[in-house]
Amino acid sequence: MTAALTVRVAEDADLPALDRGLPTGRNDAHRAFLARQAAGEVTYLVAWRGDAPVGVGVVRWTGRGGSPYPELSNLHVPPPVQSQGIGTAIVHFAEDVARSRGRAGLAIGVDEDNVRAAALYERLGYVDTGRRWTGSYTWYDESGAEHAETEHVRVLTLKLG
C-alpha cells in the first residue's frame, strides 16, 4: 500500500530527509530556500509520501516577470514519481498558502520548452499572460561539474477566489 501524499511548509528539521531524498549536491538548494524562508522572502513547500520527500516548490512573495502576484517557482518532482498527482498537489497547496495571505492570484513561470509542465498548469486553470522574461543560473551536477543555464520563461497566472 502506498503512503498518503501530503504537502506542507518545509521546516529546518526536514533538511536531512530532503538532502537524502531529493539531493541537490553542491547546489545546497534546500538549505538556501530554508534560509530565504526564514528571511520572509519565500515559503518552501515539500510534498511527502510517508516520511519520504517526493517534490518541492517555492512561493516567491515578490513575483518576477512583471507579475503582480506571488510566484510558484522551482517546482520539482523527480521523473520516477511524476504523473502521480504530486505536482498538482504542490500547486494547489501553493494556491492555499497565497490565499491565506490575502493574495488575489498566483503566478507560475514555465520555460517555453517545458510543454508538459505548461499543459499541467493550463489544465489547472492558469492562463498565459503574454509576459515573458529570461533568467540565467548556475547549477552543479552529481560529479560537481558546473552548468550555466538560460531559461526563456512565460508567465501564467490564476486568480484566486
List the predicted regions and their residue ranges.
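Conserved GNAT acetyl-CoA-binding A-motif
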Residues: 98-109
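Short hydrophobic/aromatic beta-strand or adjacent loop that forms the aromatic wall/cage
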Residues: 42, 149-156
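Short glycine/proline-centered loop/turn elements that form peptide/ligand docking sites
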Residues: 87, 91, 113-117, 133-140
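Conserved acyl-donor/pantetheine-binding loop and adjacent beta-alpha core of acyl/acetyltransferases
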Residues: 56-69, 134-149
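Acetyl-CoA-dependent GNAT
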Residues: 3-5, 9-80, 91-93, 97, ...
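Conserved catalytic-core motifs of GNAT/GCN5-like acyltransferases
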Residues: 109-110, 122, 127-147, 154
